[in-house]
Each structure stands twice: as structure tokens, then as C-alpha cells.
């Protein structure tokens, strides 16, 4: 994992954004270049409850919230193809349900 700080993003409300992987850093660059993207952040404070494998309620913090120029919003998770575990599937299911209730799109990007 390659963690780091993305400095001075123009479309984020913050002066820097923390990334947890090289995939996330590359995605931040794509968001900055995309003319359809109005704003984005990883520092959104969204915590989605889900039931983990031990049948206990846990909380999932999605990677990105993106707002587009047309007003739509999208919650985005970035994962490597080898990371699609049962836990990720449970988080994805909970995120989709959470987003549907709020008229937000959900997308899992696998690299």
C-alpha cells in the first residue's frame, strides 16, 4: 500500500487529501481533470453500517464522494481485483442500499 498526501486539489474543499493506495492517488488526478466533476473528497465523514461476518454491526467508510456539474452525486470505492472479499461484498450491499435512500449513485471500481 502506498499512502500519501495529495496536495492542493482544486476540486476538493480541503487543501490536501489523504490517499491509501496508488490507485486512489491516480483516481484523484482523474477527478481533478474531469470537466464533469464539480467537487470531490475522501474526507466526507460518511459511515455506513453493515453486518460483518461475525454478525456484528460495523461501519464502512467509502473512499470518495463526488458531485458532478449536473448536480448528481456518486459514492465511489476503489479496490484491487484481488481484494473483492466477502466483507467487501457486504459493505458494497450496504452502501448501495444507503445510496438508494439518498438518491446517490454507488460505484465500485476494481483495478
Give residue spans per PLM region.
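Electrostatic, structured charged patches in enzyme active sites and in nucleic-acid/phosphate-binding
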Residues: 1-111
Amino acid at each position: 500500500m502506498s499512502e500519501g498526501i495529495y496536495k492542493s486539489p482544486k476540486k476538493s474543499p480541503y487543501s490536501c487529501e489523504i490517499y491509501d493506495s496508488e490507485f486512489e492517488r491516480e483516481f484523484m488526478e482523474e477527478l481533478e481533470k474531469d470537466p464533469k466533476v464539480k467537487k470531490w473528497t475522501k474526507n466526507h465523514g460518511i459511515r455506513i453500517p453493515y453486518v460483518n461476518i461475525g454478525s456484528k454491526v460495523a461501519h464502512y467508510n467509502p473512499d470518495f464522494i463526488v458531485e458532478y456539474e449536473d448536480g448528481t452525486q456518486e459514492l465511489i470505492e476503489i479496490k484491487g481485483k484481488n481484494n473483492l472479499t466477502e466483507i467487501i461484498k457486504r459493505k458494497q450491499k450496504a452502501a448501495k442500499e444507503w445510496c438508494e435512500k439518498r438518491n446517490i449513485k454507488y460505484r465500485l471500481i476494481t483495478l
